[in-house]
C-alpha cells in the first residue's frame, strides 16, 4: 500500500491526496474475511507506568455467523518463544457469542514507563473463532457401582417408590426420611454440606438399558440429588442427597425420571449448583465461595467437586471470564479429575468475587479438533496472562520444534494427575465404573460414523465468500500454517476454525497502515494499527479490604 508523504512546501492538494488515501484505506480495512486475524498495533493514547495495568482498546471488531468462542491471544512470533510473561504482556481474551470488540488487559512488567513515543511499544495478537457444535451431556448419569462384600453392603435406608412407565421414560415418585450427616467442605460458601443416601428397588426399570436420571421436583428447594448409582445385580437404584442450608428437612419428596440418554459426555455428579447448563454445548461455572484477591493474598484456588468424562470422544476446555486485573487458568480439563482453577491478581487494586458469580464457561470439542503437539506429554491449562497463539508451518509443529513452557518459579501447583479425583463422597466406600456398556461401546461407534455429517453442518448458513475462505484444504502440505496454542500444548487446522468478518475502526488507521494476505486469504495481517489505553474500571468493593494505595510497582505475578 502506498504511503502518504507531505512537505512544508506542498499545498492543499497534498492534504486532499492524504485525505483520499486515508478514505481508501478505511474502505479496505472496513470488512475483511479470514480464518485468523493477525493484528500488529502501536500502543498510543496514554502512558503506562512500570508494574501497572491498563486496558488496551484495539479498536477492532470481529463477527461470526454462528455462536463461537471468540479468542484474542498474544502472538508467539517464533516456534522457540516460550509462554513466559513479557515486558508488554497481553492477557488472553475469550468471549462466547457472535461478535466482540477487542479490549484486552495490558500489563507493563518491564522496568520502564511506556509512553506513546517510546521504543518497543508494538504488540501483536491473533484473533480466531472456535466452533461450538451441539454436544449432549448427561447431568445425572447412572453409574454402576462395584461394592465390596456383596448385597449386605447395600445402604440400610430404603424407600418405597411409585414407578410408572411413560412413552419415553420411567417416572418415579417417592418420599424418604433422610438420615442426614454433616460434612465440612472449605470450598463451599457455607463451609459445610449435609449428605444422606438411600436405595429403592428398580422394579420393572431395565437397569441394563437406562443410563440417566433427571430430577423433576423436590419438596425442599435446598435439597437435590447429588449422585446416582445402580448395584451389580441390577435390582437397586441408590440416590445420594445433598442439602446446602443449616437446617435440613426431616422428610423429602422426590419426583424424577429415568431414561436412556447415551450421551457423549457425562458429569461425574449433578452439575447443580455450581455448573449451569448451556443450551447446546457446555456449562457456565459459578464461583462456589466468595473471596477477595489483594496484594497480600494475590491467589486463590477455586475447587468444583465435579468432573466430566468423555470416553476420549471430546476435549473439555475451560474459557474464563474477562475480569480486569484478574488472571484465571484456562485450557483443557482432564477426564475424571476434580475441577481446580487458580485465580491470580494482576492489577493494582483488590478484587472481590462473589458467591455464584460467573467465573467462565466449559465447552466440549470433538476429538480431532485439537491435536496434542508432538513431544508433549499431555494437554495442560495455563493462566490467562500466559495464553499465546502462533501460526507455524505444519512441518515444524510435527517435528516438535515448538518450545515447551518454561516455569517462571519453582513453586508451581501440583499437576492434574496428582489431583486425581478421590470420590469425595465420604458417606460411602464405593468405587464407580467409568461408564455403563451402552455409553462406552455403542455410543463411541455411533459418534465415529456421524463425524463427517457434523463437519458438513458447520458450513450451513454461511455466505459464499466465507465458505470459500474456509474450504481450501491443505492436507498433506507440510508448508501450510497451523494455529498453535503452545500454552495448552495443542494445535488446530485453520480449516476447522469459524470464518471471521473483521472491521478496523477508521480512527485506528495511520498513513502507514497496511494489509497482507497469506494462505489464499485465510490469514490476514493488519499492521501498524493505532490502539489506545483506557483506565481499568473500579473493581467491585470488597467487604474485608480496600483498594491498595501503595505506590510500589507491582512485580510479575507468581504463576
UniProtKB/Swiss-Prot annotation:
The modification Phosphothreonine is found at residue 223. S-nitrosylation limits ability to undermine the cGAS/STING antiviral pathway. Interacts with the host protein DAXX; this interaction takes place at ND10 and induces the reversal of DAXX-mediated repression of viral transcription. Interacts with UL35. Interacts with host TMEM173/STING1; this interaction inhibits the cGAS/STING pathway. Interacts with host RB1; this interaction mediates RB1 proteasomal degradation. One of its GO terms (cellular component) is host cell nucleus. Belongs to the herpesviridae pp71 family. It holds the Pfam family Herpes_UL82_83. It is found in: Virion tegument; Host nucleus; Host endoplasmic reticulum. It comes from the Viruses. Residues 404-440, 530-559 are annotated as: Disordered. One of its GO terms (biological process) is symbiont-mediated suppression of host innate immune response. Changing residue 218 to S: Increased inhibition of STING1-mediated antiviral response. InterPro entries: Herpes_UL82/UL83 (IPR008649). The modification S-nitrosocysteine is found at residue 218. Residues 431-440, 543-559 have a biased composition (Low complexity). Residues 415-430 have a biased composition (Acidic residues). Keywords: Activator, G1/S host cell cycle checkpoint dysregulation by virus, Host endoplasmic reticulum, Host nucleus, Host-virus interaction, Inhibition of host innate immune response by virus, Modulation of host cell cycle by virus, Phosphoprotein, S-nitrosylation, Viral immunoevasion, Virion, Virion tegument. Stimulates viral immediate-early (IE) transcription. Plays a role in the inhibition of the host innate repsonse by targeting STING1 and thus the cGAS-STING pathway. Also counteracts host DAXX-mediated repression of viral transcription. Displaces a DAXX-binding protein, ATRX, from nuclear domain 10 sites (ND10) shortly after infection. Increases the basal level of SUMOylated DAXX in infected cells. Stimulates quiescent cells to re-enter the cell cycle, proceed through G1 and enter the S phase. This is Protein pp71.
Amino acid at each position: 500500500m502506498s504511503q502518504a508523504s507531505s512537505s512544508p512546501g506542498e499545498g492543499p492538494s497534498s492534504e486532499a491526496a492524504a485525505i483520499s488515501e486515508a478514505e481508501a484505506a478505511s474502505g479496505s480495512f472496513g470488512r475483511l474475511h479470514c480464518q485468523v486475524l493477525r493484528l500488529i498495533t502501536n500502543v498510543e493514547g496514554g502512558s503506562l507506568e512500570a508494574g501497572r495495568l491498563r486496558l488496551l482498546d484495539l479498536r477492532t471488531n470481529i463477527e461470526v455467523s454462528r455462536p463461537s468462542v471468540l479468542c484474542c491471544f498474544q502472538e508467539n512470533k517464533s516456534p522457540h518463544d516460550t509462554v513466559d510473561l513479557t515486558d508488554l504482556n497481553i492477557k488472553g481474551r475469550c468471549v462466547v457469542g457472535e461478535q466482540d470488540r477487542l479490549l484486552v488487559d495490558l500489563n507493563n512488567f518491564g522496568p520502564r514507563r511506556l509512553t506513546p513515543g517510546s521504543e518497543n511499544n508494538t504488540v501483536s495478537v491473533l484473533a480466531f473463532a472456535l466452533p461450538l457444535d451441539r454436544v449432549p451431556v448427561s447431568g445425572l448419569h447412572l453409574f454402576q457401582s462395584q461394592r465390596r462384600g456383596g448385597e449386605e453392603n447395600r445402604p440400610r435406608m430404603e424407600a418405597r417408590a411409585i414407578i410408572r412407565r411413560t412413552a419415553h421414560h420411567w417416572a418415579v415418585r417417592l418420599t424418604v426420611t433422610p438420615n442426614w450427616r454433616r460434612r465440612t467442605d472449605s470450598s463451599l460458601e457455607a463451609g459445610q454440606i449435609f449428605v444422606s443416601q438411600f436405595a429403592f428397588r428398580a422394579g420393572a426399570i431395565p437397569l441394563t438399558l437406562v443410563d440417566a436420571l433427571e430430577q423433576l421436583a423436590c419438596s425442599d428447594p435446598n435439597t437435590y440429588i447429588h449422585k446416582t448409582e445402580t448395584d451389580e445385580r441390577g435390582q437397586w437404584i441408590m440416590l445420594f442427597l445433598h442439602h446446602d442450608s443449616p437446617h435440613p428437612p426431616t422428610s423429602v419428596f422426590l419426583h424424577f425420571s429415568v431414561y436412556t440418554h447415551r450421551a457423549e459426555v457425562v458429569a461425574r455428579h449433578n452439575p447443580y449448583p455450581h455448573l449451569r447448563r448451556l443450551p447446546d454445548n457446555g456449562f457456565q461455572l459459578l464461583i462456589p465461595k466468595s473471596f477477595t484477591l489483594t496484594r497480600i493474598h494475590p491467589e486463590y484456588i477455586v475447587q468444583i467437586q465435579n468432573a466430566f468424562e468423555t470416553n476420549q470422544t471430546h476435549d473439555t476446555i475451560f474459557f474464563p471470564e474477562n475480569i480486569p486485573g484478574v488472571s484465571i487458568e484456562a485450557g483443557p480439563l482432564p477426564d475424571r479429575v476434580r475441577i481446580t482453577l487458580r485465580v491470580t491478581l494482576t492489577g493494582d487494586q483488590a478484587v472481590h468475587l462473589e458467591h455464584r458469580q460467573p467465573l467462565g464457561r466449559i465447552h466440549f470439542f470433538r476429538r480431532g479438533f485439537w491435536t496434542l503437539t508432538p513431544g508433549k506429554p499431555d494437554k495442560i491449562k495455563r493462566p490467562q496472562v500466559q495464553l499465546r497463539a502462533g501460526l507455524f508451518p505444519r512441518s515444524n509443529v510435527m517435528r516438535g520444534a515448538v518450545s515447551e513452557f518454561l516455569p517462571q518459579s519453582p513453586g508451581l501447583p501440583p499437576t492434574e494427575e496428582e489431583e486425581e479425583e478421590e470420590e469425595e463422597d465420604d458417606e460411602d466406600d464405593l468405587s464407580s465404573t467409568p461408564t455403563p456398556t451402552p455409553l462406552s461401546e455403542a455410543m463411541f461407534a455411533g459418534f465415529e460414523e456421524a463425524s463427517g455429517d457434523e463437519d458438513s453442518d458447520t458450513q450451513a448458513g454461511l455466505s459464499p465468500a466465507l465458505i470459500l475462505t474456509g474450504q481450501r484444504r491443505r492436507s498433506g502440505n507440510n508448508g501450510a500454517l497451523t494455529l498453535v496454542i503452545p500454552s495448552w500444548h495443542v494445535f488446530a487446522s485453520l480449516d476447522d476454525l469459524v470464518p471471521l468478518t473483521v472491521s478496523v475502526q477508521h480512527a485506528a488507521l495511520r498513513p502507514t497502515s497496511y494489509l497482507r494476505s497469506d494462505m489464499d486469504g485465510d490469514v490476514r495481517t493488519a499492521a501498524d494499527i493505532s490502539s489506545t489505553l483506557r483506565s481499568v474500571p473500579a473493581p467491585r468493593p470488597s467487604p474485608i479490604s480496600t483498594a491498595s494505595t501503595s505506590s510500589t510497582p507491582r512485580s510479575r505475578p507468581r504463576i
